[in-house]
Amino acid sequence: MASLALSGSCSLAFPLKSRSLSLPRPPSSSLNLTKPLRSLDSRFSLLKSPLPVSLRRRSSTLVKASSTVASASSSPTPPLVPAPVPWQGAAIKPLLASIATGLILWFVPVPEGVTRNAWQLLAIFLATIVGIITQPLPLGAVALMGLGASVLTKTLTFAAAFSAFGDPIPWLIALAFFFARGFIKTGLGNRVAYQFVRLFGSSSLGLGYSLVFSEALLAPAIPSVSARAGGIFLPLVKSLCVACGSNVGDGTEHRLGSWLMLTCFQTSVISSSMFLTAMAANPLSANLAFNTIKQTIGWTDWAKAAIVPGLVSLIVVPFLLYLIYPPTVKSSPDAPKLAQEKLDKMGPMSKNELIMAATLFLTVGLWIFGAKLGVDAVTAAILGLSVLLVTGVVTWKECLAESVAWDTLTWFAALIAMAGYLNKYGLIEWFSQTVVKFVGGLGLSWQLSFGILVLLYFYTHYFFASGAAHIGAMFTAFLSVSTALGTPPYFAALVLAFLSNLMGGLTHYGIGSAPIFYGANYVPLAKWWGYGFLISIVNILIWLGVGGAWWKFIGLW
């Protein structure tokens, strides 16, 4: 055996062609070493005898060494190449598109009547919007770069660029996410969600309509769409999605969450338009209307004019989204029974659930009666969060971990600041006057002229991150021109006031509820904008078509 091993190792390590020694096969019988060696075979009998232990060890060592040498010579080990580190920075093409947009507009000659600062800020603002749409970086990072560019170019001072971080609306939105954390953490969200599923959960459409009309019923009592969306309905909708197996990031968003989030958002702008007290900026519209046409828009007048087109929109929009952006789970006849089993398993409310429920009732009560008590919406939300922090229902570390809240606060405040200074620098006033001169010079009937003004007023909202800012900048000018062209003043004022809410559905920053529902991350940005534009057309057709007939019936024109 030693000879076979040795010869094998030699042939492996040193392949000889013509000079290799061929050993004869040993006889099958056992060898007798005492007999004389008479043949050639016997001369090699020593090779067939057992080797001493020391020699066998050396032979084994030689075999291993020769094998190592052979393998090394036949297939050399390649050098270790470190795995390439993936690029962690911005997506290059979207970044270049954003920069190119800003540079092109920056070097376009400034129109007459526009200041250089206003034009530069418009270039930075549009570049930021393109960046927010294409997302070379997260939204907060893009918005922060936009603010940095405005400060670097001396377009805005640092104080002006970051002034909107003192605005209450971005903070109210961030606080809404903290409330949602407590709502879900305590289990109260699941409890309420299971109750909804038990009552309406046999179909996704029924579940959606139950939320839509619940929000509409609360709208006249809570004069902040941000508070309604963030403090009450976002936590509830998120809990419903999770309870139905629709989660962010695991491919189940379309089971229910995508459709439900988009539906609740789009209908929140409809309910905001239906009542004078349903949105914080609605009284501003009424006040500006009185200053312009000297006619008062009362709560009853507003509701009477808006109720019919509003109800039609609340019915049509969820069903339309159900058809074009459907949930994959449409029917679940066993859901009510399963929800009841879950409720039975949960048992009575825990201490933290009771604290969360009491805090929510306190906050909502202050949102409803806060105007009489001198407490605004964001102050009420801070008070509610303070209760949750003191009682340990929510911890500050958990608030810090809500990255979506801080990201939303950053980009929303940045857009509010830039859009606000576009108005302060006179760009919006210049645009309004230009539109007024153009439409007034067309010589059209008041119906056609008003239709053009309505569309321009509506779709310029892409440049605004606040309904109040849009109303303050353009409402008076467009109402004045409309009446000058023959539009009935009271009719024009109400239509512009209604549209001042509906236009918030265009983007993820156009109204207070937009960043809240978008921040849940169930709907991609491109779809959010695409469906926002589509629903805007539907709403305009309903409010000017069905609404126009209703307003004719009640004598507004």
Curated annotation (Swiss-Prot):
Key word Transit peptide present: yes
Sorted UniProt keywords: Chloroplast, Membrane, Plastid, Plastid inner membrane, Transit peptide, Transmembrane, Transmembrane helix, Transport
UniProt xrefs under CDD domains: ArsB_NhaD_permease (cd00625)
Organism: Arabidopsis thaliana (Mouse-ear cress)
Family of the protein in this entry: Belongs to the SLC13A/DASS transporter (TC 2.A.47) family. DIT1 subfamily.
Induction description: By nitrate after two days of nitrogen deprivation and re-illumination after three days of dark adaptation.
InterPro entries linked to this entry: CitT-rel (IPR030676), SLC13A/DASS (IPR001898)
Identification of the protein by name: Dicarboxylate transporter 1, chloroplastic
Positions of disulphide bridges: none
Predominant location category: plastid
A Pfam family reported for this protein in Swiss-Prot or TrEMBL: Na_sulph_symp
Protein function: 2-oxoglutarate/malate translocator involved with DIT2-1 in primary ammonia assimilation and in the re-assimilation of ammonia generated by the photorespiratory pathway. Imports 2-oxoglutarate into plastids as precursor for ammonia assimilation. 2-oxoglutarate is converted to glutamate, the end product of ammonia assimilation, which is exported to the cytosol by DIT2-1.
Record keyword rRNA-binding present: no
Membrane topology value: Multi-pass membrane protein
Consequences of knocking out this gene: Reduced growth and amino acid levels, but growth inhibition is prevented when mutant plants are grown under non-photorespiratory high CO(2) conditions.
CC terms in the record's Gene Ontology section: chloroplast; chloroplast envelope; chloroplast inner membrane; chloroplast thylakoid; plastid
Subcellular location: Plastid, Chloroplast inner membrane
